[in-house]
Amino acid sequence: MNYTTQMDAAKRGIVTKEMEIVAKKECMEISKLMNLVATGQVAIPANKNHKSLSPEGVGQDLKTKINVNLGISKDCYNIDAELEKVKKAVEMKAEAIMDLSCYGKTEEFRRKLIDMSPAMIGTVPMYDAIGFYDKELKDITAEELLAVVEKHAKDGVDFMTIHCGINRETAEVFKRNPRLMNLVSRGGSLLFAWMQLNNKENPFYEHFDKVLDICEKYDVTISLGDACRPGCIEDSTDPSQIKELITLGELTKRAWERNVQIIIEGPGHMSLSEIKTNMLLEKKLCHNAPFYVLGPIVTDVAPGYDHITSAIGGAIAASFGADFLCYVTPAEHLRLPNIDDMKEGIIATKIAAHAADIAKGIPGARDWDNKMSRARRDLDWDTMFELAIDPEKAKRYRAESIPEDEHTCTMCGKMCAVRNMNKVMDGKNINILREDD
């Protein structure tokens, strides 16, 4: 193999098997895709050691992708339950799965996940460090943190969230500009605490070249984490968030010089009115690198319904340029999601992604909707169920309330506009009060 990473291959004019697969999935000319990868506008996360991967592209002119978070915690340590979630996420065609395990020895679960998953796999090595070394945060060294990154890369992780942007300068901006919710990024807050406790620079920022060495070796895409993402709408688009974003843009250029692929992570919680501006800022400051957003969650008052607040923000964000949506479940801010929560989160996020693809004019995005509309016009319920984003729920709702006229539903019955227009346009009587002829 005479290239190091997907970006290196693209710059050399080499078509990789991963590029071929992505181009086919996206109905895109391979030459266009290669140019987008070469310029960093598209990333194809594909670790050389992830043998079960079905690669996906993330970025400009591609379908909006979704990520599913799962993993074990101290309070919910059940590997089998998390593996069931993996199966469900794959069944529901999530393009990415992030293992956010934050307790104990996580290697067993991570390796099983990578072995069984065709979806691209992401991790946050910072979460793993405390359990991996069985040390308190303050006592972990910079070298040990980098060793965890290499361990995850060697295991086959396709992309890693690394919070390189919360350096000393960004930390000072944060301290000078108090927030209502401080820092809500788990990995970012751990790094900030490590820096404060040890009076040292962020090791991932200070040793960024060593991070690049590891990622180049295994072709790991760096998902540059946003430690300063807003955790409430009051804190959005503030000096800390913007200072970190500028730093991420600078690190992006350094990574691209080494042919390491980059994804930028973004907010977070913010008002609907700020979403477009934030998408434009990221694309400008980070040189059109792919943008990966958590939500954005557009109101802070809906615990139990944050899959909805997130889907609203995600649809708008993706329509204005976000490329990758992290799902949010109804359990957000409340507890570890169960498999039912996960399904609700996936469906909500897939709806947001698809709605955005229609708005962006992604080729073929409207075809799905047009097929559904034709089935509705024809009152073809079997085809409607086949095309539904959640066939199981659609079938269950219809079965719960059977209409007199099997072609309609119990909302309108024989006053169904579709039924009656079909009949009238065919020159037939609509017969609302009596049996059809």
From Swiss-Prot:
Catalytic reactions of this protein: 5-amino-1-(5-phospho-beta-D-ribosyl)imidazole + S-adenosyl-L-methionine = 4-amino-2-methyl-5-(phosphooxymethyl)pyrimidine + CO + 5'-deoxyadenosine + formate + L-methionine + 3 H(+)
Co-factor remark: Binds 1 [4Fe-4S] cluster per subunit. The cluster is coordinated with 3 cysteines and an exchangeable S-adenosyl-L-methionine.
Function: Catalyzes the synthesis of the hydroxymethylpyrimidine phosphate (HMP-P) moiety of thiamine from aminoimidazole ribotide (AIR) in a radical S-adenosyl-L-methionine (SAM)-dependent reaction.
Positions bound to Zn(2+): H269, H333
Family membership: Belongs to the ThiC family.
InterPro entries xref list: ThiC (IPR037509), ThiC/Bza_core_dom (IPR038521), ThiC/BzaA/B (IPR002817)
Protein name: Phosphomethylpyrimidine synthase
Pathway: Cofactor biosynthesis; thiamine diphosphate biosynthesis
Residues where substrate binds: N69, M98, Y127, H163, S185, R186, G187, D226, A227, C228, R229, E265, Y292
Residues that coordinate or bind [4Fe-4S] cluster: C409, C412, C416
GO cellular component, one term: cytosol
Keywords (A to Z) from UniProt: 4Fe-4S, Iron, Iron-sulfur, Lyase, Metal-binding, S-adenosyl-L-methionine, Thiamine biosynthesis, Zinc
